[in-house]
């Protein structure tokens, strides 16, 4: 069985996730950012959409409020962050200090920027495979993230 959760605050803003019904879902909806925390017994994924003009300090505080970077969890942060990686802002510095590594290494947007990010705990970065694929319905690439099974046991 599967279900769908979404967080959105307007046209062309928001995030959606398909998930197994046994997953725990929490949604944060602010005007300039939205995220869904998707958690199973094996993995925790934060799926984000960040609008231009976002207060990254406020976003980081929201991530903390939703227990981002619990060292006991296998945590990933993915999404359209609307800044070119590697970035030089409060969020990118927070993730670096928290020992997360940005895994996307080539442009994901038609303008030639890396706007879609995947952050993984550095200790698990060798267990992740990233594949880009072009989609006809978006100006962003589709990104497939594969996690090696031994990482979630």
Describe the function of each predicted region.
Residues 9-15, 107-117, 139-141:
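RNase H-like two-metal-ion nuclease catalytic core shared by retroviral integrases
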Residues 2-3, 45, 119:
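Generic preference for hydrophobic
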Residues 1-3, 102-103:
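Conserved active-site segment immediately N-terminal to the catalytic lysine
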Residues 17-108, 124-153:
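Active-site regions of metal-assisted phosphoester/phosphodiester hydrolases
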Residues 2-10:
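A short, structured active-site edge motif that brings together acidic residues
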């Amino acid at each position: 069985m599967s279900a769908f959760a979404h967080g959105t605050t307007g046209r062309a803003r928001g995030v959606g996730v398909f998930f197994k019904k046994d997953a725990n879902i929490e949604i944060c909806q602010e005007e300039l950012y939205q995220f869904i925390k998707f958690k199973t017994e094996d993995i925790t994924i934060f799926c984000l959409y960040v609008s231009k003009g976002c207060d990254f300090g406020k976003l980081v505080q929201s991530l903390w409020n939703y227990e981002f970077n619990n060292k006991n969890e296998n945590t990933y942060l993915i999404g359209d962050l609307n800044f070119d990686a590697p970035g030089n802002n409060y969020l990118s510095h927070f993730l670096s200090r928290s020992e997360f590594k940005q895994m996307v290494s080539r442009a994901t947007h038609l303008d030639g920027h890396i706007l879609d990010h995947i952050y993984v705990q550095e200790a698990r970065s060798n267990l992740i495979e990233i594949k880009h694929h072009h989609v006809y319905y978006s100006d962003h690439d589709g990104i497939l993230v594969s996690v090696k099974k031994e990482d979630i046991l």
